[in-house]
A protein has these predicted regions:
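A short beta-loop-alpha structural element at the N-terminal edge
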Residues: 2-17
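Hydrophobic alpha-helical core bundles mediating ligand binding, dimerization, or RNAP-core interactions
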Residues: 17-22, 36, 126, 147
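Active-site rim helix/loop that mediates acceptor-substrate recognition in acyltransferases
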Residues: 26-57, 61-67, 82, 87
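Conserved acyl-donor/pantetheine-binding loop and adjacent beta-alpha core of acyl/acetyltransferases
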Residues: 61-102
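Conserved GNAT acetyl-CoA-binding A-motif
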Residues: 97-98, 119, 126-139
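Conserved acetyl-CoA-binding loop-helix of GNAT-fold acetyltransferases
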Residues: 105, 111-124
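Conserved beta-strand-loop-alpha-helix junction that forms the acyl-donor binding cleft
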Residues: 105-110, 134-145, 158-162
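C-terminal "cap" of GNAT-fold acetyltransferases
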Residues: 141, 149-151, 156-187
Length: 187
């Protein structure tokens, strides 16, 4: 049963994403579903999700943020739980400062190559746009391991018990492409 990218997400999908996040993170690290939905509703490139047999299998939030928010994230002084629509930058505001807010695959759908599929779909809208860099804020050891596998550099601990990572956009794209040419592990 292959995973398929969901062409148009609904508020219910965002509620399902929030429920999936709660399996891994405390609520203090999660942007409420209604707020994430508001980003997507105005900026549909901000979130990509996939399903298997009608069940949410995973998702990625990758989107441009205002330069001041990027710097606050980078410095470890902004918890994206408090991210609001006004913090998301329109893709016309270039160059783009990207934030990889979350990438999560449900445990039962791991080892299917879904991370690669989600990242490829998430990168597509930005392919021809000038992006400066990408920052991520990792709450778990698995998140830190993901960031390191994908070539991010650990910058510092945040003021909200997480780790901040960053890399150039060009490097991130190359690392995603490199990892996408490696076949998924056998089950």
């Amino acid at each position: 049963m292959p995973a398929t990218i969901i062409p148009r997400l609904t508020l219910q999908h965002f509620r399902d994403m929030e429920a999936l996040e709660l399996q891994f993170y405390d609520a203090e690290f999660i942007t409420p579903a209604e707020e994430s939905w508001s980003w997507y509703d105005l900026h549909p490139h901000s979130t990509v999700a996939a399903e298997v047999d009608g069940k949410l299998a995973g998702f990625v939030n990758l989107f441009p943020v205002q330069p001041a928010i990027y710097e606050a994230l980078r410095s470890g002084q902004f918890n994206d739980h408090f991210m609001e629509l006004e913090h998301v930058a329109p893709i016309t505001q270039q160059p783009l400062h990207m934030f990889l807010s979350c990438i999560l695959v449900d445990r039962q759908f791991r080892r299917m190559g879904l991370t690669r599929q989600l990242l490829q779909a998430a990168l597509r809208p930005y392919a021809a746009l000038p992006c400066v860099g990408v920052v991520t804020d990792n709450v778990t050891a698995d998140g830190c391991a993901f960031s390191e596998r994908y070539g991010f550099t650990r910058l510092r601990p945040s003021d909200h018990d997480s780790w901040i990572y960053e890399q150039s956009w060009e490097s991130f794209v190359k690392n995603c492409e490199r990892r996408s040419t490696t076949p998924p592990p056998a089950n």
